[in-house]
Amino acid sequence: MLPPGSKLDAFPAPKVQDMPLKATDFDDTGLNTEPNNLAAIDSLIIYRALRWGRHIDLLLTDNRSYRSRDPGNHDEINPLFEGDTLGFVPEELWAQLDAGRDYAGGHPPEKLVFGDRSVANYRAGEAAQTMLGAKQKAWFLDRLRGATATWKVWGNSLGTLDTRVDPQNLPPALSGKWKGKGYGLMTVYDWGSMYHERAEIFDAVRDAGVTGLVVVAGDRHSFWAGYAAKALPPAAAFEPVGVSFVGGSMTSVGSAEVNEYVQKKDNNPTRGLYIAEDKDGKPQCTENLTLRHGVRSALEYEKTKDVQKALAARNPELAPHLTFVDNGGHGYATVRCDAGTMVTEFVCIPRPVTRAPGNDGGPLRYRVRHEVALWRAGERPRMRQTVLEGDVGLSV
């Protein structure tokens, strides 16, 4: 997909003029088609396919250059969230914003509603949100359908696993803080909330009978493992078409560190959804429980400091797509593939605030192995998780 005459080891700067980007130059997917802009973007095409032997087709995508405008980054939406203190976005509301005119088979609502407030649906006449853009998406789907290696590894910069939460299950003392009717989303910036285009990709995988799909990503500054599915119940049946992983950061701050500083203890009844102290007074990332098992689980841990009691309070319907979440994890991940098995290993180090002693990188917090056997078309992938060493805490 490189421009004519380009090489992978040379990136000559294109000759472009500094021209204004006019509103009339944007196409339906949000790409500005001004010639100088296109020349700049196309001078270094990131998306490409690489092959390793019989077992790995590595497909890399560019999630930045062709992305459409964030549908939630509009002043029109602000009145819905005035005074909101939870910060979650209703799952259904985001689906309406994401799909635009394509919502509900081409029948978007006239109003966007959150609790007793509503605004005009400014997305009703606009195209669905896109991460890849039309040209790259066509290339990606074609390569996915035609991939012949045992494992099709999709390498990209943004995770595909939903960051869903269940604020509708908050206890009575806190239930008034949630104005939505059902599930919410903790974040809405990556593939985890790119419902429409993600569904298009995963439906193509299913319809073509593609097996061995593995999504590997970063960006969240945390470790995640689970199943690649286009949607979660009750919006749709849970039908995973692959497995998905997010690797942690070596040094960049994650949400666990942030919450230790910003979630103050005084007059903060929802603090336990993010951070709580264990029996020894050490902070623990209960945000993992909120995402993996639900708000009741996180608040139970805050109250009792007991992991088993927290798990007993879990919401089993919240996150069928997740098997592991550690928003306090630093380290790296490895992926190994052979004729019948894919293994992803998370290697987590202690929080990197001081240099580790010795030349071996120092001690580990944990190592976790995620093993997946190759599945047949029409079957569901199955993941087996093993803690090889250390303590994964509230991550499972």
Where are these regions (language model features)?
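Long, structured stretches of catalytic cores involved in phosphate-ester chemistry, encompassing
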Residues: 1-396
